[in-house]
Amino acid sequence: MKKYIFMTLTVALLGLTACTEDAFDRINKDYEHPSPEAVPAALQLTDAIMSTGFSTVSGDFAFYLSSLNEQEIGMGNNQLMFAEMRNSSEWAASTTFNNVWNSIYGNLQNIRQMQSKIENEVPGNVGQFDILGMAQVLEAVNFGVLTDMFGDIPYSEAVQGQGNLQPKLDAQKDVYTGILATLDKAIGNLEKGKSLTSAGNQDIAYKGVASKWLAAAHALKARYLLHKLAVEPNVLQK
């Protein structure tokens, strides 16, 4: 009898040993928070567009610039007067600039991830030249707003995560040069991806129509060439 009990316990223990590793693998896998690599670039596109529209273009900068320009000149200083009544230090508070600075660089991290997945042909992202071009247009907009507002900014060494926590400042004229080069890449990829529909409904700006992104890229290229002329007047002679 003891012999049978011993054999039964041995088999049971062996069975537990065999399944323990698999069970722990399942338990330790985080299904709620997949790694960035597991998320297709197309799904990140929506967030990149939203963040660019609401944080970069229509965020704090839009309020402060309108107050310092249109409202200050045309409305009897109303906005500035009310701002001073609310908080006399509002215009010098660190959050005035830190919030939008951090949100734009956070958005750029997302945009660079999208590009990396397509360029490195991560499964599920292969050949999506239309999305790659869209991401490059969005990158140009975000860096463009940053340098328009702050002048010299981290650019060539920026958005490297833990790889570089103290990126150098690049001169504004060099940032504009980089932006124009990025837009050239975007135009090439959008031309290549004209017939693709990789973005689908994730493109909440132009509904996945590459030709509209192309038009935006050309318009932005004209804008930033003019901005570059302001800091490097002889640029057209090169």
Question: Where are the language model's segments positioned?
Answer:
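Intrinsically disordered, low-complexity segments enriched in small/polar residues
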Residues: 13, 57, 72-76, 81
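Enrichment for repetitive, rod-forming helical segments
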Residues: 9-10, 33, 228-230
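Structured, solvent-exposed acidic/aromatic patches
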Residues: 37-42, 76-238
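Membrane-proximal, proline-rich intrinsically disordered regions
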Residues: 4, 19-73
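Alpha-helical transmembrane segments and their juxtamembrane interfaces
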Residues: 12-13, 31, 57, 233
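Sec-dependent bacterial lipoprotein signal peptides
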Residues: 1-17
